[in-house]
Amino acid sequence: MKQNLTELVFIIDRSGSMAGLEVDTIGGFNGMLQKQKKAEGEVLVTTVLFNHESQTIHDRVEIDKVPLLTENDYCVGGCTALLDAVGETVEHIKNIHKYARAEDVPQHTLFVITTDGMENASTKYSCVQVKRLIEEQKERGWEFLFFGANIDAVDVGHDLGIAKERVANFNNDAKGINLNFAVVSEAVSCLRTGKQLKADWKKKIDEDYKNRKNKIK
């Protein structure tokens, strides 16, 4: 294993329901990226944007060479093929690690998955297949964080093989998205140093979600 090397993978929803939140998503992602560029240690960044199709805009790029996300990259529209996006990306990274020299395999691997709606367009992967893939990689020490809006994220995460302790419901608006990326940055910083995520790593998101949900009631 290569010490101080982190495999950091983002799978980000850009379906039609994200319309109006492009600027916040781009800004939140770029702000998080800039913070991580200043931290010690090597990081390989993969970024997959998905609707009914997936597009990989960064494929294991060294973090200091990753360009900022732009409006040309993050164009919303279409449906939500979450299972295909996750399945394809996990398979891709899995195969790279499988055939790499042992000394080149990253010490840490973290997937950050964000969606704002229910799966409704996948044709290549089933939920059972994705769950099996994720559970296999968790046994190898991979971490998966799942952020969901307008769904029961805990239930969806469970169906994907992601424990509720690694799942957060969030408010899909400017404040919620920016809070997501701020918390993700803290989590990435923690894992990059080899520390375990604290039990309350998502406390800020949970509090924002519950407080504003209660106000609506």
Q: Positions of the model-derived regions?
A:
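Acidic, low-complexity intrinsically disordered regions
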Residues: 1-217
